[in-house]
From Swiss-Prot:
The lineage of its organism: Eukaryota, Metazoa, Ecdysozoa, Arthropoda, Chelicerata. The keyword Iron-sulfur does not apply. It comes from the Eukaryota. Disulfide bonds join C3-C17, C10-C23, C16-C33, C25-C31. Keywords: Disulfide bond, Ion channel impairing toxin, Ionotropic glutamate receptor inhibitor, Knottin, Neurotoxin, Postsynaptic neurotoxin, Secreted, Toxin, Voltage-gated sodium channel impairing toxin. Insecticidal neurotoxin that reversibly inhibits the N-methyl-D-aspartate (NMDA)-subtype of ionotropic glutamate receptor (GRIN) and inhibits inactivation of insect sodium channels (Nav). In vivo, is highly toxic to insects. GO terms for cellular component: extracellular region; host cell postsynaptic membrane. The presence of a 'disulfide through disulfide knot' structurally defines this protein as a knottin. It comes from Ctenus ornatus (Brazilian spider). Transmembrane segments: none annotated. This is U9-ctenitoxin-Co1a. Pfam families: D_CNTX. It is found in: Secreted. GO terms for molecular function: sodium channel regulator activity; toxin activity. The keyword Secreted applies.
Length: 44
């Protein structure tokens, strides 16, 4: 399965994020994570 667009939520095919990070998903197998605004409010 491929990721959705860059603004799409994480899916099982691109499940690199949790409550503290967001996925930047692309049309491929590459996926990068970054801190989300809401996740930053809660320390890891």
């Amino acid at each position: 399965g491929k990721c959705g667009d860059i603004n799409a939520p994480c899916t099982s095919a691109c499940d690199c994020c949790g409550k503290s990070v967001e996925c930047d998903c692309y049309w491929g197998k590459e996926c990068s994570c970054r801190e989300s605004f809401f996740g930053a409010a809660t320390x890891l």
